[in-house]
Amino acid sequence: MAGPAFRAAAVRVRVPATSANLGPGFDALGLALGLYDDVVVRVADSGLHIDIAGEGSETLPRDEKHLLVRSLRTAFDLLGGQPRGLEIVCANRIPHGRGLGSSSAAICAGIVAARAVTIGGEARLDDAALLDLATEIEGHPDNVAACLLGGFTLSWMESGAARAIRMEPSDSIVPVVFVPGKPVLTQTARGLLPRSVPHVDAAANAGRAALLVEALTRRPELLLPATEDRLHQEYRAPAMPESTALVERLRGDGIPAVISGAGPTVMALADADTADKVEALAGTDWAANRLGLDQQGATVLPLATASDT
C-alpha cells in the first residue's frame, strides 16, 4: 500500500493553554484559556530541524525526544507513513510544568499538524480518532479534550476510547492565573494521591462537579461552592504549600480559586468587575495573568505575515 502524500507548503497550528480539574472535576473537566503556543511544520527532503523560541527554549530537546516530534511521528504512523524530513518552528508562550497544559499543547499541536500536512489527512484521522490518539499519548483526556475542542469540556473513557463533549462557558467569566517561579512535575503531584478516598468525599465531589457544569455555563454566581474539592488538592498540598495557601486565601475572600491541573499554578475565576482586583492580589512571588477564554481549540491558521500581531 502506498504511503501518504504530503503538502509542499508549511502548516501553522495554534493550540491553547488549558486548566484541568477546576476543583472537583478530577481528570474529567477542562477549560481552554487564551494563551497560545504556535507551531509551524513543513515537510522537508531529509533530516529533522527544530527551532524553539519562548518557554522551554533553553531546556527542550531538539531531536526525536521532543514531545511534539514524538506526537507528530505517532500521528504520521496512523496516517500511513513518515515524511522524509521535517522542519519545525515553535513559538512557546505556555509555561512548562505549571499546570497549564503545556504537554497537552505539544501533543495536540503535533497530531493536528501531522493531519494538516498530510493530503487527505482528515479522512484518515477524524476528530474522534484525534482525541483518542491525544489521550493515548497524554494518558488522560481532560487537558487534551479542552485543547482540541476549546471552551469548557467534559471528557471520559468508554470501552478504552476517549470521549468528550464541549460546552459554552459563560462569557462573564474572566480567568486569572497566578504562576509561580518554580515548576512541579505532574508525576510528583500524581504520586501524592491516595489509592482510595472516603466515600463521603467521593460523594461530595460528585455533587460539586455536577454543580460546576451549571456554574461555568449558566450561573457563575455558584462558582465558589461549585469549585470545592476533596479528592486531590489537599493531598497535593505538600508539593505546593504556597499554592495551597493562596487558594485558601482567595477562597476566604469569596473568590472561586483552584489549583490548575496538577499545579502549582492557581487559577481564580473572576468577572469583569473583580478581575483587576484579583490580579492585584498576586504579590511578588507570582506572575498574575488575566486571560480570556479560548473558544476555538487547536486551529490550523494561515502562515504568519509581517502584518500579524
From Swiss-Prot:
Known function: Catalyzes the ATP-dependent phosphorylation of L-homoserine to L-homoserine phosphate.
Subcellular localization, as worded in the UniProt entry: Cytoplasm
GO molecular function, one term: ATP binding
Catalysed reaction, written as an equation: L-homoserine + ATP = O-phospho-L-homoserine + ADP + H(+)
Full protein name: Homoserine kinase
Organism per entry: Streptomyces coelicolor (strain ATCC BAA-471 / A3(2) / M145)
Lineage: Bacteria, Bacillati, Actinomycetota, Actinomycetes, Kitasatosporales
Gene3D superfamilies reported in the protein's UniProt record: 3.30.230.10, GHMP kinase, C-terminal domain (3.30.70.890)
Record-stated family: Belongs to the GHMP kinase family. Homoserine kinase subfamily.
Aminoacyl-tRNA synthetase is among the record's keywords: no
Enzyme class: transferase
Keyword Nucleus listed: no
